[in-house]
């Protein structure tokens, strides 16, 4: 092993430097440097608290805070030299602070460990990312509401088993995705409450002997509460797992939505058109217009599901308190956040631009005997038991398949072959409009109910 000298803040106990490969293997700065802003935010709050607790002088506090702000400017200007030998974002910033302001920089870490420091950084970062994601969900929901209102009367087939089932309106179908996203929003809001608890002050695992005032840093950093147990504060990552669980559900919804969009843009369905800016072509087939955005979102969902499993597996065997294993929490969490945020952004941009092919949807709804249930309900209203009506209509559908006729295309005489209870008024029931208008209750597909649901949706978004 190489004995190339490394620069470590903890080297006093060691008689030889860390091997150069091991230093690179154990370093996390390549990926955790994205926490720099929140690391500096936490350090500024910590320095302010140390001054109020009498650990730092006001001059020392001011020097530290000014130095940290200058370092943030260096990072954002691309002028900061990230060093692998300093392991991580925390030690890189602390070393640079000491370079800038001298020995006072070494006092910043008083009463603090990297264990509670990184746990705080991740929570601050994730809290901000959740807020961004919540905004993208709302933006996507707004697009769905606009489309649902615009197409409240456009009729399409509803499916079960991907077989034609009953007519629905396009607006009603889109509102199903609105409802799923509303639950995703609720889950993330709830998750944020548990993210927003402060571990800073837990130190390595047992707290600190310094007279820290955790309520001060809690207030300065905008946390809702101080963590109640120092061992728990530095060791658990359940908040990251919970986020990945909520993110997995949201990505599952987007993946299902993507599957429908992919199907609907195909020549076999031809239900919708996506703008060219959300599609790509083929390097060999000149006619192709591929729905890459929904296909990629569908594919990316697996990444987030995998990160959830990875984090659960990471944590399941760890004794209290902190273990180096937890360095592996960041990359899956970062990627889960990036994937969900970017997928939502793509959908929020794309959904308002979707154009339904109204006639193709209507023709598809007309095929497949989609008003068969309406005929059965019609016979129930004539006094027949539903099971008998089900069988009667089943025979009528069989006849329609053999003769190539939809129920609405059959003559009255043909329909009466299956039940003498059928009369001229049946044709109002068998129209697509009659079918959707009949389902005029809360949650139903009738255009009036779609518009009412849009109004409720707008009120929900306005209350956020």
Swiss-Prot record:
GO terms for biological process: arginine biosynthetic process via ornithine; L-arginine biosynthetic process. It catalyses: 2-(N(omega)-L-arginino)succinate = fumarate + L-arginine. It holds the Pfam family ASL_C2. One of its GO terms (molecular function) is argininosuccinate lyase activity. It comes from the Bacteria. It is found in: Cytoplasm. GO terms for cellular component: cytosol. InterPro entries: Arg_succ_lyase_C, Argininosuccinate_lyase, Fumarase/histidase_N, Fumarate_lyase_CS, Fumarate_lyase_fam, Fumarate_lyase_N, L-Aspartase-like. PROSITE patterns: FUMARATE_LYASES (PS00163). The keyword RNA-binding does not apply. Pathway: Amino-acid biosynthesis; L-arginine biosynthesis; L-arginine from L-ornithine and carbamoyl phosphate: step 3/3. Its EC number is 4.3.2.1. Keywords: Amino-acid biosynthesis, Arginine biosynthesis, Cytoplasm, Lyase. Belongs to the lyase 1 family. Argininosuccinate lyase subfamily. This is Argininosuccinate lyase. It comes from Azotobacter vinelandii (strain DJ / ATCC BAA-1303). The lineage of its organism: Bacteria, Pseudomonadati, Pseudomonadota, Gammaproteobacteria, Pseudomonadales.
